[in-house]
Amino acid sequence: YDRFRTDVDWRDQIAATIKFLKRLAPIARDLGIHMNIETHEEITSFETVQVVEAVGPEVMGITFDTANVLQRAEHPIWAARRVAPYVRQSHIKDAGLGYEGPHVRYQMRPCGMGVIDFGELVEILHRANPDLHLSIEIDQSRDEMPLGKYPSVMEITDASWLAGHPDLTKEELEAYVELVQAYQKLIDG
């Protein structure tokens, strides 16, 4: 993940992205088009909001991937509330979360079979944008991806991992851990 590269700081990458998108913004305005940034595996919902607000919500929005935020130890409902005013597209996905030692393992699940409360999440998105289209994204297993496997483990007990997520509050992390614990009970039977 770019977030944990050592040759370039993550904050510098975000700043460079904002600078580039600001250069594109006047062109987008002139053409009447809209750009989106996705809540992808390596970027937090806090950072996507930062990008949108810096570039301008009239030309920049968010593609909200409901499961990707879990890989940044964000609670999906909390993230939905953050991004809802800026969501222009969606990737509706679900995932299960369970413990792997002291860390959390992320695994794709069919919608409704993971940790996400879609009733509440969709309501939040609908209140912000009643015309939003919800697109279900079908994910493939990590083993089948062209680039091979990459870790889907969140090291939520590691101080350096947490330091890489400065916007994540103790309260949200605790709510996230509750999701993990509840799903782990399902795994354990």
Task: Please provide the spans of the model-predicted regions.
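Histidine-acidic metal/acid-base catalytic patches
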Residues: 45-59, 70-189
